[in-house]
Amino acid sequence: NLLQFNKMIKIMTKKNAIPFYSS
């Protein structure tokens, strides 16, 4: 699910404070 994936990405990026993806 793309929505779930986006949610996970947001949480991870917030945790790491580093966007490891570009789109």
Swiss-Prot record:
One GO cellular component term: extracellular region
Misc note: Negative results: does not show myotoxic activities.
EC numbers: 3.1.1.4
Keywords from the named record: Calcium, Disulfide bond, Hydrolase, Lipid degradation, Lipid metabolism, Metal-binding, Neurotoxin, Presynaptic neurotoxin, Secreted, Toxin
Annotated GO biological process: lipid catabolic process
Cofactor descriptive note: Binds 1 Ca(2+) ion.
Cofactor: Ca(2+)
Reaction it catalyzes: a 1,2-diacyl-sn-glycero-3-phosphocholine + H2O = a 1-acyl-sn-glycero-3-phosphocholine + a fatty acid + H(+)
Designated name of the protein: Basic phospholipase A2 mangshantoxin
GO molecular function: metal ion binding; phospholipase A2 activity; toxin activity
Tissue: Expressed by the venom gland.
Function in brief: Snake venom phospholipase A2 (PLA2) that displays presynaptic neurotoxicity. PLA2 catalyzes the calcium-dependent hydrolysis of the 2-acyl groups in 3-sn-phosphoglycerides.
